[in-house]
UniProtKB/Swiss-Prot annotation:
Protein name: Sec-independent protein translocase protein TatB
GO biological process: protein transport by the Tat complex
Protein source organism: Mycobacterium ulcerans (strain Agy99)
Protein family: Belongs to the TatB family.
Xref: HAMAP family: TatB (MF_00237)
InterPro entries from the UniProt entry: TatA/B/E, TatB
Ranges where the record places region Disordered: 108-130
Function: Part of the twin-arginine translocation (Tat) system that transports large folded proteins containing a characteristic twin-arginine motif in their signal peptide across membranes. Together with TatC, TatB is part of a receptor directly interacting with Tat signal peptides. TatB may form an oligomeric binding site that transiently accommodates folded Tat precursor proteins before their translocation.
Residues passing through the membrane, by range: 2-22
Length: 130
């Protein structure tokens, strides 16, 4: 919950508390807030253990499904496309195509189909164009 608060933010909170509450009431306010946080944490851990007891093995299944949902929420659109539509092959995005050997016969087949004819082919005559 407070994992993102660093020492700098904590120092700012203490200074603001010192200015607002004064030096005589600040220790009591700190004790009260730490006690309230401790009670909230104990309450939440009690609720979690009660849910685990009531639901049994379904609780672990629910936590697994919620974990998968959290992984999907953290995916970027590119990662979602790569995983679900392209089966993890991201060469379309990176440009690293490893199957260059299979592309060369197709190029040769196209080149043989487009060989020059024996006689030159003239475009049809259009009387309106002249």
């Amino acid at each position: 919950m407070f994992a993102n608060i660093g020492w700098g933010e904590m120092l700012v909170l203490v200074v603001v508390g010192l200015v607002v509450l004064g030096p005589e009431r600040l220790p009591g306010a700190i004790r009260w807030s730490s006690g309230a946080l401790r009670q909230a944490r104990d309450y939440l851990s009690g609720v979690t253990s009660q849910l685990r007891d009531d639901m049994g093995p379904e609780f672990d299944d629910l936590r697994g499904q919620l974990g998968e949902l959290q992984k999907l929420r953290g995916m970027t659109p590119r990662a979602a496309l790569t995983k679900h539509l392209l089966d993890g092959d991201d060469s379309i995005f990176t440009g690293n195509f490893d199957k260059a050997a299979s592309a060369t016969p197709a190029v040769d087949a196209v080149a043989s189909a487009q060989e020059a004819p024996d006689e030159p082919v003239r475009p049809p005559f259009d009387s309106d164009a002249t």
